[in-house]
């Protein structure tokens, strides 16, 4: 089971967190601080797996971001590396070569994509095409809702101007 997902920049700034196990807010801050320090200080040639508090942390660096997932000891690290890569590929497909700024300004989309991949710390959808189709449908629904809200606002504005 994946206990949490953490995206951290090279500067140590948290860009995304998703918790699948209960942690108090104080504990979350401590975990983020601790893991950021451990992962950011590791050399690029070292293994992408870290033993930590009875768990394993699997991480991978893409550009200026570290994608980290905390898993149980008995879980397969290579599978989790593939899940991380899968997530990055979907982000790349959606944003067109994703960068840190995409995640900063469109964090809600990054969370939505992650929620399509993982539920309760387990892989839900392995098909990139299916996830892309679902995200596209969601984007279309948002556009329709914006158009309807805009037309309702126009009707209200016209009614109040009379």
Swiss-Prot record:
The record's subcellular locations are:
Golgi apparatus; Cytoplasmic vesicle, Clathrin-coated vesicle membrane
Q: Which residues cross the membrane?
A: none
Q: Which SUPFAM superfamilies match?
A: SNARE-like
Instruction: Give the bilayer topology.
Output: Peripheral membrane protein
**PROSITE patterns on file:** CLAT_ADAPTOR_S (PS00989)
- Top-rank taxon of the source lineage equals Eukaryota
* GO MF entry, a single one: clathrin adaptor activity
Q: In which tissues is it expressed?
A: Expressed in roots, stems, leaves, flowers and siliques (developing fruits and seeds).
* Membership in a protein family: Belongs to the adaptor complexes small subunit family.
Protein's recorded name: AP-1 complex subunit sigma-2
Native source organism of the sequence: Arabidopsis thaliana
């Amino acid at each position: 089971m994946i206990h949490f997902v953490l995206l951290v920049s090279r500067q140590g700034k948290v860009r995304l967190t998703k918790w699948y196990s209960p942690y108090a807010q104080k504990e979350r801050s401590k975990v983020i601080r601790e893991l950021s320090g451990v992962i950011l200080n590791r050399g690029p040639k070292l293994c992408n797996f870290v033993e930590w508090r009875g768990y394993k942390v699997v991480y991978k660096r893409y550009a200026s971001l570290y994608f980290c997932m905390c898993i149980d000891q008995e879980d397969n690290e290579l599978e989790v590396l593939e899940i991380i890569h899968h997530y990055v590929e979907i982000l790349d497909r959606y944003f067109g070569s994703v960068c840190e700024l995409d995640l900063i300004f469109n964090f809600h989309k990054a969370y939505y994509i992650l929620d399509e991949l993982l539920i309760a710390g387990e892989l839900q959808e392995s098909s990139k095409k299916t996830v892309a189709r679902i995200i596209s449908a969601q984007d279309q629904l948002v556009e329709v809702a914006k158009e309807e809200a805009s037309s309702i606002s126009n009707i209200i504005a016209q009614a109040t101007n009379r």
